[in-house]
Amino acid sequence: MKSRTAILVALCLAACWYYAICYSSAVRLGLKPGVVVDFYPLWNGSRAILQRRDPYSLRVTEENEVAAYGATAKAIGNPVEQRFVYPIHATFPLMPLSLLDFRTASGIAFWLFAVLTALSVGWLRGRWDRTTVLYCALTFSSYPVIYDLQSRQPVLLFFGLAVGSFALLRAGHLIPAAILAVLSTGKPQIALPVLLPMLTCAFARWHERKRFVISLGTFSLVILSVTIAVSPGWMREWIAALHAYLQYIRPSLIVSIFGSQVGTAISGILFLALIATLWLHRESNLLFQAAFSVVIFHLIVPYQTYNAVMLLIPVVWAEDNAYLIPVRDWGNQLILVAMRVALVGSWIANAVGIILWHTSPLGKLIAWLLPGTMVRMLLGSLVVMMVVQVVFPSKRLAANLATASRTVALT
């Protein structure tokens, strides 16, 4: 990395983190100082399981709310409950942290999630070089990742597990890949966009990768048996918790645009189209399939900015393959430019946001809206890019994807 690039990246990191600190100080991640709301329910749910209590119970929910708000949500009129909304096995990877006090566990979680995020960049690229270091630095300069680290959002854990499974499958380590894949389903909306193309690839090359599918099924049954033994009837309680959770979070982008009934129908069609596309492109590069899957899932699942770390997958694919797009391929070049403008714009927006925070109420409002707006712009450009590559692929790019796919098949 050149010195000038290193200086720019360092400035970008500093500006983005300062902006995020201003933002979190204004909105306050929790009403009670020292408590990060996103991580506490998972930690407390794990603790409840060790104490042989029901993590979905009203008592545990109220403990989460008192930790976050200083009182129950009902007592202060807050509609946002702090329920345990994970499947039971989501607690397994972090179970040792529940033996520690929350402050210590939270500190460990911060560094664990940061390491997993950095490793995910290298795992996606399949190599460790200066470009990977640059990608890592820019990843830690993105607001969604910064927020996830600030709040210890478990999405980073399950994203890291899913990408780790992806890398192991690509490297031919099928049984460890299956184990990590099952553990990553502790947050299904994060795991499924990665697991679907992995399963498609495994079924398409059944003789080479059948051990992955068999191991995935076997370990899933083992985990299911353990969860039922730990908490009988947990599925019913989990579904009830999810139903309550969906009442106060944002709907998917498709539902937001088209309304509940039409949006749900379109989402179903998009999901079926995704499965069909993955199968039709089953001989394509696995990272390309995962990138396409991620952008479609981002349209059809409830939209949360902190899940935008998933967009790292299509961004890495796009940047690593940008050189294959011919200069005269104006359509693809324009889409690539739009994606890069959205990326650079998100970092510039953070710098602008720092200034706006210290101006008028209108300035603060604009600064407040910047992170979500830039993520949507990036998502929009990625959706267009991936759809165009599926429908009207660049010839050089298509040839490279097929070659890369055959190369991976031989490893």
Residue ranges with predicted function:
Residues 158, 192-194, 214, 345, ...:
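Intrinsically disordered, low-complexity segments enriched in polar/charged small residues
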Residues 180-198, 300-307:
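Transmembrane helices and adjacent periplasmic/lumenal helix-loop junctions
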Residues 120, 126, 187, 326-327:
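Short, surface-exposed, polar/charged, turn-prone segments marking secondary-structure boundaries
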Residues 384-397:
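Membrane-water interface at the C-terminal end of transmembrane alpha helices
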Residues 7-12, 217-221, 326-350, 382-385:
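Signature aromatic-anchored transmembrane alpha helix within multi-pass, membrane-resident enzymes
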